[in-house]
């Protein structure tokens, strides 16, 4: 697969529509499937990486870049672009695939994932990868960077919005909640965070390691508007993001229930695929 996989503006950003028709949903599903294929390709070629969480978040990445965010792949550093921070940075393979599909770089770069000197590293690198707005990897830190971007927009009277995706295991980190307090205190209504709730982390289930529920009430108590969705349902993703635009004076948390390893039958809901690359037979 080469440049023919690049789909730059096939789905236009439209904040005024009244829902997607079946053809739009089908196109998003096709793009998300290609993103999952890219994540598998990249981790296979690298012989390392994190396919499970990459697959669970692929639908969210796809919707954001092809339907929600105002970005320009030909000008990745455009000052007025919407920003995206992948706080769970280890799940970048499917994000890289979405960026390739959007036209930030060639699809073949995925075959060099994690190679020394390659454009695409094991965690997002804002200096080396077009389309990456923040270098991440140490869990819990991305939301702080997203808060800074959102506050900068407010101070500069800019209209861009900031989006971030966190893992559910990641919200066990204390820094997440410090940043959440900051976001609410500063009334960052231009900030939307997704929590990818696939229920698994490297050491087992999230409930076993350090239960985080009731997560909705926790974010609400910190001053967030909260929406709960199926993270694989594009209609629900769209509805939550449309509602998020109507929220004033507070940040938004979208709690997205997902399946770790989504789309690959033997990977789904299996903690072992958190950080294991597939082999040729698989």
Segment roles from a protein language model:
Residues 39-42, 54-178, 184-185:
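Cofactor-binding active-site loop characterized by glycine-rich and histidine/acidic residues
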Residues 19-35:
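N-terminal hydrophobic or amphipathic helices/low-complexity stretches enriched
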Residues 32-48, 196-198:
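N-terminal capping segment at the start of a domain
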Residues 8-14, 18-21, 70-80:
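Nucleotide/pyrophosphate-binding catalytic subdomain
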Residues 131, 135-138, 143-246:
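Thiamine diphosphate
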Residues 234-282:
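Glycine/aspartate-rich loop-and-adjacent alpha/beta segment that forms the canonical ThDP
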Residues 90-91, 95, 198-199, 233, ...:
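Glycine-rich beta-alpha junction loops
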Residues 1-7:
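Short, small-residue-biased leader/transition segments that mark boundaries at the very start
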């Amino acid at each position: 697969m080469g440049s023919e996989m690049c789909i730059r503006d096939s789905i236009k950003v439209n904040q005024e529509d009244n829902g997607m028709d079946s053809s739009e949903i089908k196109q998003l599903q096709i793009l998300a499937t290609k993103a999952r294929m890219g994540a598998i390709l990249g981790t296979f070629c690298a012989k390392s990486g994190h396919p499970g969480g990459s697959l669970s978040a692929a639908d969210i990445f796809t919707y954001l870049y092809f339907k929600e965010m105002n970005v320009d792949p030909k000008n990745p550093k455009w000052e007025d672009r919407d920003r995206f921070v992948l706080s769970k940075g280890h799940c970048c393979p499917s994000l890289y695939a979405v960026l390739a599909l959007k036209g930030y770089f060639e699809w073949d770069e995925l075959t060099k994932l994690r190679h020394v000197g390659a454009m695409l590293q094991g965690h997002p690198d804002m200096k080396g990868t077009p389309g990456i707005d923040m270098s991440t990897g140490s869990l819990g830190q991305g939301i702080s960077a997203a808060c800074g971007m959102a506050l900068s927009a407010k101070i500069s009277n800019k209209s861009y919005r900031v989006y971030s995706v966190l893992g559910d295991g990641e919200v066990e980190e204390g820094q997440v909640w410090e940043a959440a307090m900051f976001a609410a205190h500063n009334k960052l209504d231009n900030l939307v965070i997704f929590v990818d709730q696939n229920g698994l982390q490297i050491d087992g289930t999230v409930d076993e390691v350090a239960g985080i529920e009731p997560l909705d009430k926790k974010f609400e108590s910190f001053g967030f508007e909260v929406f709960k969705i199926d993270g694989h349902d594009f209609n629900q993703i769209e509805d939550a993001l449309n509602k998020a635009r109507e929220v004033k004076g507070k940040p938004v948390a979208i709690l997205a229930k997902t399946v770790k390893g989504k789309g690959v039958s033997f990977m789904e809901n299996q903690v072992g695929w958190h950080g294991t690359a597939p082999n040729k037979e698989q």
